[in-house]
Amino acid sequence: ESPMAGDSILRPELSTAHLGQADRDLDYEARYQLQPHVVYLADSGGLKVGVTRQTQRHTRWMDQGASRVRVIAETTNRYEAGVIEVALKNHYSDKTSWRHMLAGVQSGENLAEEALRASQFFPEEAANFFVPEGEEVTLTYPFKGAPKVTSVKLEAYQRLEGILAGIRGQYLL
C-alpha cells in the first residue's frame, strides 16, 4: 500500500516516524512527517482548525478556499501538530463548510483573539508550540457575481459548457 495513503495523512496524531516506527514506509514517512508543521485557524465558510507542513501552508490555505488564516502553533513534526489539532477539534471544526465558503460566508471572528482563546485548549505538553504573534494572511478569490452553488460530478459529463467566473479553493465557479 502506498505511504501517501497512510493513516497519518488525514490524522496527523497517528504519525509514528518520530518514534522510528513505520506505518507503511519509514523513509517516506520520515521525509513527510519529520519536518516543521503549523497548526492554524482558517476562516473558510466558518472558523476551522487545520494542520499542514510549514513549507506548504500558503498552498494548503488556497486549496481550502480560506479567506483569512492565522498560524497558532509551529511544531517540529507532524505528530506534535496532530496532538494540538485533536485537542482543538473539541472546540473548532476541522472541516471546511464548502457551501458557506463558496457563498462568501465569513466567521467575522478576530483571529488574534481567537488564537489566544485556542491556546487555552492546547495540551499542557504542547503549550510551548503556541505562537502569540503567528502569521496572519488574507486571501481573495475574485469572480464576477455571486455564484449559485451547485455540486456537479465532472466524471458524469463528457463535456461541460459554461462560463468560468472564478476559482475558489478546489472549486470552479
Features from the language model and the residues they span:
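Non-catalytic accessory segments flanking enzymatic or RNA/DNA-binding domains
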Residues: E1-L173
